[in-house]
Regions:
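N-terminal secretory signal peptides that target proteins for export/translocation
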Residues: 1-7
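Hydrophobic alpha-helical segments, especially transmembrane helices
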Residues: 7-9, 37
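A broad, low-specificity signal marking well-ordered, structured residues that form hydrophobic/aromatic
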Residues: 9, 130-131, 273, 298
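Bacterial N-terminal signal peptides
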Residues: 11-20
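Terminal targeting/pro-maturation regions of precursor/exported proteins
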Residues: 26-173, 177-178, 345-346
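C-terminal "post-core" interaction segments
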Residues: 29-47, 136-139, 167, 176-346
Length: 346
């Protein structure tokens, strides 16, 4: 996930935060020699887990690999992987173009697959007193419409919540099991009606922790900020639940990654909130994008995500209640919600 807030870097970091350095066997793409040196220098200076790498040895191996594209690629991949905990990446110019195009197509609603339909059929029917919203992965496409894309997606998620909020809901399920990452900010703003517990003012819902002071994620009635900087804002106050502060059950799984894990952490520590399912992917760290001299880019992992209480280690997030199957996870979440005082007797 993203710390650097310049729009192009932000867009690229959100887009590629879960990708690893890889190349087709037929054509190995590599940074230029100058860019390779810059890449290693940047990793040694700024990467979150830079102390895990013997940098003189890594440079010696890179030098010995000259003339062998496969070995060069493998050395760079190892340097990035070890110093980022598996969350960083090198992106060629061509790959940035192709992935931006692919991501643009991927923002359309996905068709329901046979496996999705089977899982839905096996899940228990929800009690009508419980609302549900699925916050899936979402990446913005680099360009001048980045802010608009974030606003539109956040507004869409808030509308899903609003349309279910008849006044009879005594609890909600936030399903993050399929959230493989992307841009966390529209996710947090989209679920703000459930995330926020106050009507006015700012709420700190998490942070990025670096060697310096933490950078807090702040939810306002209309948007999201990183520290004092506005990341995305709807322009007017977003939707507010008819019964604010109701119990929320959070569903997680091994596909919940990166921005998805940021969303889990934002909800963790919220009053009347409990998580169910399986541990997350384990990349709850934040990325920035650093352009290199040849036009390619380094997705650089620089900080750890933490919840509103300062808890977080960059590793897998374990749910409060471990459940394995989709049906068992939904059933456990529903049982807990219905046992809460907000639902009792309603």
């Amino acid at each position: 996930m993203l710390v650097d807030l310049r729009m192009r870097s932000a867009a690229l970091g959100a887009l590629f935060c879960t990708m690893a350095l890889a190349a087709p066997a037929a054509a190995i793409e590599l940074p230029t020699a100058q860019a390779r040196a810059e890449l290693l220098d940047t990793l040694e200076r700024e990467a979150l887990y830079r102390d895990r790498v013997d940098w003189p040895e890594m440079r010696a191996r890179l030098s010995a690999a000259q003339g062998n594209p496969e070995k060069i690629r493998d050395v760079l991949k190892e340097a990035i992987g070890r110093s980022s905990g598996g969350h960083g990446a090198w992106l060629s110019v061509e790959r940035m173009r192709s992935e931006a195009t692919r991501s643009g197509r991927a923002t359309a609603p996905a068709a329901i697959t046979a496996s999705d339909a089977t899982a839905a059929a096996q899940s228990p029917a929800l009690d009508p007193r419980i609302g549900q919203v699925e916050i899936g992965g979402f990446s913005v496409v680099p360009g001048p419409a980045v802010v608009q894309q974030m606003q539109e997606r956040a507004a869409r998620w808030q509308a899903i919540i609003r349309d279910q909020d008849t006044g009879k809901r005594c609890g909600w399920i936030v399903d993050l099991r399929g959230n493989t990452g992307g841009n966390m900010w529209p996710m947090l703003l989209g679920m703000a009606p459930l995330l926020r517990i106050t009507k006015e003012g700012e709420e700190t819902v998490g942070s990025f922790a670096t060697a310096k002071d933490p950078s807090p994620w702040r939810s306002t009635p209309s948007g999201m900020r990183l520290g004092t900087r506005v990341i995305v804002d709807l322009g007017t106050p977003g939707y507010r639940l008819k019964h604010p502060g109701v119990p929320v059950a959070v569903l997680t799984g091994p596909r919940t990654a990166s921005a998805g894990e940021a969303t889990v952490l934002a909800l963790r520590g919220r009053p009347q909130t409990r998580s169910f399912g399986e541990p997350t992917a384990g990349v709850s760290t934040a990325n920035v994008v650093r352009p290199l001299v040849d036009g390619s880019a380094l997705v650089l992992t620089t900080s750890v995500m933490r919840d509103r209480n300062g808890r977080g280690d960059g590793l897998k997030i374990t749910p409060d209640q471990h459940t394995r199957s989709d049906a068992a996870t939904v059933a456990a979440a529903q049982a807990w919600l219905l046992a809460q005082p907000a639902c009792a007797g309603r």
